[in-house]
Each structure stands twice: as C-alpha cells, then as structure tokens.
Amino acid sequence: MRVLFCSSEIYPYAKTGGLADFSFCLIKYLKKYGVKVKGVMPYYKTLKAENLRKTDKGVTLNLNGKDYTFEVYESEDCYFLRNDELFGRDYIYGPPGWGYEDNDIRFGGFSRAVSELISTGQLEADVVHANDWQTALIPLFLKEVFKTPVKTVFTIHNLAYQGLFPKETVERVGIPPYLFHMEAVEFWGLVNFMKGGIVFSDLITTVSPTYAKEIQTQEYGYGLEGVLKKYSYKLRGILNGIDYEVWNPEKDKYIYQNYSLRNYSKKFKNKEFLSKELGIEAEKPLISFINRFTHQKGVELILNCAEEMSKLNANFVFLGTGEYENAFLDVSKIYKNFKVFAEFNEGFARKLYASSDFILMPSYFEPCGLTQMIGMRYGCVPIVRKTGGLRDTVKDISEGGYGITFEEPSKETFLCSLKRAIELYENAKKFRNSVKIVMSLDFSCDRMTKEYIECYEEVQSHQ
C-alpha cells in the first residue's frame, strides 16, 4: 500500500502546533508497520531541512490569472513543493494574529499542485491522507477535477479553523464553479476549504471519539454540524497518540533525573531540583499548565480564579505563549504561588513534565490534546475539563480512575477540582497509586497507527 500524507506542517521541517507532531508520528509509525508512506508539504523559507534533493518532477498552474511553477524537492521521507513567491515568506500562515491575504491561493494552489502531480503519476499513491483546511481541497481536486481513482482520507484536527475565503476563490484556485453550492464548498456565501474535504473525501477521521460526536452538535460544529451529521457514516474518531520514543522520562536528556515506572520515585528528585530553581516549596503540590495562553485552553477560567487559587496550598507554574500572556505575567506579580514563563521552551517544558505532580487542562474545547498524554507519560496526574479527547483519556478517581475531571466551565467546579487534587496529593498512598496508573497507560502512536491502517484498507476496499 502506498500512502501520500499531505500536511501544511511536518516535524522537524516546519512546526507551529500539534499538526506537525501528529504528521511526524504517523509517518514514522506507518513505516514501522511496513506501509510505503511519504509526506508532502510546502517548501517554506523557514524550512528546517538539509541535503534536500531537487527532483525532475514539477507542475505549473494558473492561479488567479497568473502562472505559478511548483518544483519538487525530496528527503528520505517527504516531498516539498517549492514556489518562493507563495511560500518564501517569514511565516508559515502569516504574522502572529492574522493570516496572509492570499492563503487561499497559497494552500489552494498547493492542494491543486499535489493533486495534479498525483494525476500525472509524478507522485504515486493508493491512498492520499489530507489534514485540516490547508490540504482539504485535495480530495475535491482528485475526484472532481482530475477524476483519479485514488482513495482519500481527510483528518479534522480542529474544526474551529476552516479556511474561509470569498466567493472569488473558486476562480482564483480552480475549483469547478458548479461546486459553489451549499452541498459542496459554499458556506454562507463564502468558500469553505474544510467543507470540501468533508464532502469529497472517502473517509473522514478526527482526533478523538468524543470530538467526532461533539462536532455534530451546534456547540462544537461551527456551522458544519449539519454536513458532518450527513456524512457521519464515513466519520471515525481515532484518538491521537504520542511518540513514546520522543517522550520518555527514562531517556529524556533535558530532565534532572531519569526515571521510569519501575523506579518512579526518582520523579520526585526532579521536583526537588526544579523547586529549588524556582524558589518554591517542594513539599507543596506542583500544578502545571503547559499550553497556549488562548481562549480554547480555558485560560479565562484560570485568570478569573487567580485570587482563590492564590490561597490554595499549592504552587502553579504556567508555560506558554498567546494572547493572554501579559495577563498571566501581571497575575504572577501579585500572587507568589504563580510562576509564569511566557515562552515556548521545550527543554523547560520537559523539566516541568518531569517535576510536576499535576498537569492542568481546563480547556473549553479540546479535539484531542497531547499535553495530558505527555504529562501522564511523565507521571503527572491530570486535572481536566471533560471535553473532546480529554474525556476519552482521563477517568475520574471517584469512578475508579486516576485523574481529576470536571464538567461545567465555572469557577465553582474548577476550584472544586483543584481542591480535590490537593486532597489527593495529601493522601500519599492514593496519590502515588494514581501516578503509577497514569505512567502505565498506553497513549502511544502504535495504537493510533493501527487504526489508520484499518482506515486505509477500508477505503481501498471501496469500489
């Protein structure tokens, strides 16, 4: 089976978020299971790659009345489509806070170029796997423009970002005009790239079973709940995984003291070192938030509860960047048990995972979430809101589980969950048992990869 994995970002070549990690992980593990897989992504100015080989493959497209030539480079595991006018820029999607105005041409053009390269046999595939709005038009182009027999799988990582563009985009990127209607890519007078992937792919996946259900509701569907209900027969929820070779406290070179499930008590040495470094009391529970400071991650809930949290017998560490980072920095100046680091620092993040007693994720919505999985891999007991993948990965201790969960995103329920966590910590035997359980859970890429292989086999069996 030959799989072409299409993504706007693949680690280590380009990364702005979890899509890059997912792409890297799935490609790596598909190879492990004998699948002939290769990634394909844009050749960005910021691309982190060496020794790429320029191939004799390529395609020229007319986009918005102008010709663009895409040259094809390759590494061992990935193709890169190069057009410096479109992708030779300082940012992948645009400066912080906004996207480039021609992102429809950039990613619509990329999707059409990939599709034409497949249709002409320059890129080989039995199954094409597209991801999120940036590559969502590939199933449409393959089926409606190039009429290829290649099967397609489309993964929704976050429905909140759909790739919405004006009606003129139809002509600008070469979408057949007859597809601009509500049963295809039209969405309230706009072109919706994500909708194109949903309608024209052979199978849709999303990143957790609960999120697959949630996106069919008005609360989480962002206007696409109707079309997702219509195509629910081809929708699957597959829980994301993390690479246990990359995230491994037994071999992590960044942390103070390596440890594993067999000698997990060494984890607490990490906490002692970090507490000394940060000037906090090691005997108090350490609750950490390692994520973006954005609305989705429930940060308003934290900020609204800051005064009450300052009175709890616990220390809180926040690591991340985003629109609320100044608000967090301001709070940290008021309350001594709040430590805030407004940066993306992988080395420090790993130290924090290894040192923390609890990992905090009060997200308003969470398609899957990797932070809680990494935290549990490192022995952090999760405190999460029951939504999306958080619901699928964390079982409350009151129900025979190992974590702390809450349902309503209110001050009362959130503070109650923090108090329950502190009570758990103060019961040393019960707390250490939870640590042992979370470290023994399997959220590896192995499980996820097997499910995707089943999806590929399913679409190949379709006539």
From Swiss-Prot:
It catalyses: [(1->4)-alpha-D-glucosyl](n) + ADP-alpha-D-glucose = [(1->4)-alpha-D-glucosyl](n+1) + ADP + H(+). GO terms for molecular function: alpha-1,4-glucan glucosyltransferase (ADP-glucose donor) activity; alpha-1,4-glucan glucosyltransferase (UDP-glucose donor) activity. Keywords: Glycogen biosynthesis, Glycosyltransferase, Transferase. It is an enzyme of class 2 (transferase). Its EC number is 2.4.1.21. GO terms for biological process: glycogen biosynthetic process. It holds the Pfam family Glyco_transf_5. SUPFAM superfamilies: UDP-Glycosyltransferase/glycogen phosphorylase (SSF53756). Signal peptide: none annotated. Disulfide bonds: none annotated. It comes from the Bacteria. ADP-alpha-D-glucose binds at residue 15. Pathway: Glycan biosynthesis; glycogen biosynthesis. Belongs to the glycosyltransferase 1 family. Bacterial/plant glycogen synthase subfamily. Synthesizes alpha-1,4-glucan chains using ADP-glucose. HAMAP family: Glycogen_synth. This is Glycogen synthase. It comes from Aquifex aeolicus (strain VF5).
